[in-house]
């Protein structure tokens, strides 16, 4: 028999699936509050969709092959190119600004390690058709609101923000004006916290920067507020408009109530080649994990992919690192949850009400909206001691048991946490079996008030 899942891939047993669902619920709930609508696209796309603009790093990590029709295809390693293609195809018909989100499964062939697998699920949130800094602020506010929804605060997570246009202007003033050395600077800044200073110096020198330029470049990541730049840089005519734009952006974040989560960090450049403006990443404040989330403005990508000249911005937030952070902060559910609302057991009335009556009643209860479990054995229902069936119900995680307590009554008894202290309740069995709407509503109301409201006590 084959072993477990492939390296870097995951099986989702019920407990793990519940944890994934916990994250997905937060993603969808916050997206709903911000008026984003959900979409999806194919997991398999033409290879050149990813090799065109994503850069060499992703191109080398693709799961790609030639299909039976001779087409070069790849499993999606990211969602933004698919999103851009879809929007470009209907650019004239879509109401602007577009506010879409998706939760695709993505695939990259890379070394599996902590926080990075060969597959993961990722929330993608994108806005198309708006150039204002308010759209950039709205986007980051979505990401931070998700952190809050999951129980995290600004002491747990920091948002590090930069602007590629500002950085390009600063580099030009420093003297780094050509595309090739600028790309080398981006690569150094992206890794500056993870490599020794002398390595950064050597790489910048190799790119043709002078010692004076190198020193000026290496000062940039130390700037933590907009007043921290050298005066000759901050006052340069080419730089000032970009500083003003970032200041406006930060002001919007203040108004949205999330400014205290945000740090200026010019080492945040994002690895993908298509970002053009404000970019950001979210990290755990202790610095123990990889980036939780990253994104920014990519105003040229839609035009490059489909000829739709529309400004756009977005972010991706994966489930792997976020899940690790929630576990580290004890904010992740440990089990698959509460099980069924009700577990049907044989009681004192099992002889008067054989399994057929039990099946009719549980069917009616399911139609009324309850989740109902039972032992799937007529023999156990009739003959197994009630205490053994109740023990099975408790192990299943059911909130309460339900049984025929006599020939004329149904008994509901809570099982979970303080529900064990809640009073049991008896209902007349005949109206329930007759599908009497009033009787079923009475049971449902009692359950909602007595069981559901106490479940999380």
Annotate each language-model stretch with its function.
Residues 19-35, 45-46, 69, 80-92, ...:
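Positively charged, Gly/Ser-enriched RNA/tRNA-binding surfaces
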Residues 144-148, 165-173:
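Hydrophobic mid-domain F-helix/FG-region of cytochrome P450s
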């Amino acid at each position: 028999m084959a072993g477990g899942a492939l390296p870097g891939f995951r099986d989702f047993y019920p407990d793990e699936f519940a944890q994934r669902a916990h994250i997905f619920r937060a993603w969808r709930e916050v997206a709903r509050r911000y008026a984003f609508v959900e979409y999806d696209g194919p997991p398999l796309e033409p290879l050149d969709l990813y090799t065109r603009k994503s850069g060499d790093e992703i191109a080398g990590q693709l799961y790609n092959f030639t299909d039976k029709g001779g087409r070069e295809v790849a499993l999606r390693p990211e969602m933004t190119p698919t999103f851009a293609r879809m929007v470009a195809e209907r650019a004239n018909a879509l109401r602007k600004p577009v506010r879409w989100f998706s939760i695709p499964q993505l695939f990259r062939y890379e070394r599996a390690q902590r926080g990075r697998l060969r597959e993961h699920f990722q929330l993608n949130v994108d806005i198309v058709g708006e150039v204002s800094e308010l759209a950039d602020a709205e986007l980051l506010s979505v990401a931070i609101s998700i952190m809050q929804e999951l129980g995290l605060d600004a002491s747990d997570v920091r948002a590090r923000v930069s602007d590629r246009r500002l950085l390009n202007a600063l580099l030009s003033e420093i003297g780094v004006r050509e595309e090739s050395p600028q790309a080398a600077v981006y690569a150094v800044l992206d890794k500056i916290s993870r490599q020794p200073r002398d390595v950064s110096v050597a790489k910048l020198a190799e790119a043709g920067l002078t010692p004076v330029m190198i020193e000026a470049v290496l000062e940039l990541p130390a700037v933590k507020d907009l007043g921290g730049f050298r005066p000759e840089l901050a006052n340069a005519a080419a730089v000032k408009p970009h500083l003003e734009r970032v200041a406006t952006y930060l002001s919007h974040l203040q108004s949205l109530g999330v400014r205290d989560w945000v740090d200026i960090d010019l080492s945040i450049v994002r690895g993908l080649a298509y970002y053009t403006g404000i970019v950001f990443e979210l990290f755990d404040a202790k610095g123990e994990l990889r980036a939780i989330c990253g994104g920014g403005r990519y105003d040229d990508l839609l035009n490059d992919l489909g000829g739709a000249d529309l400004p756009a911005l977005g972010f991706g937030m994966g489930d792997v690192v976020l899940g690790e952070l929630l576990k580290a902060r004890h904010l992740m559910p440990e089990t698959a949850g509460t099980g069924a609302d009700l577990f049907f057991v044989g009681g004192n009335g099992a002889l008067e009400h054989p399994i057929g009556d039990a099946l009719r009643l549980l069917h009616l209860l399911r139609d009324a909206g309850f989740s109902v479990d039972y032992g799937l054995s007529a023999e156990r229902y009739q003959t197994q001691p009630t205490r053994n069936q109740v023990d099975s119900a408790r192990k299943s995680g059911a909130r309460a048991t339900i049984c025929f307590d006599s020939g004329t009554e149904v008994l509901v008894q809570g099982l979970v946490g303080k529900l064990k202290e809640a009073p049991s309740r008896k209902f007349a069995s005949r109206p329930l079996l007759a599908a009497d709407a009033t009787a079923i509503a009475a049971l449902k109301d009692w359950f909602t008030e007595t069981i559901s409201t106490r479940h999380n006590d």
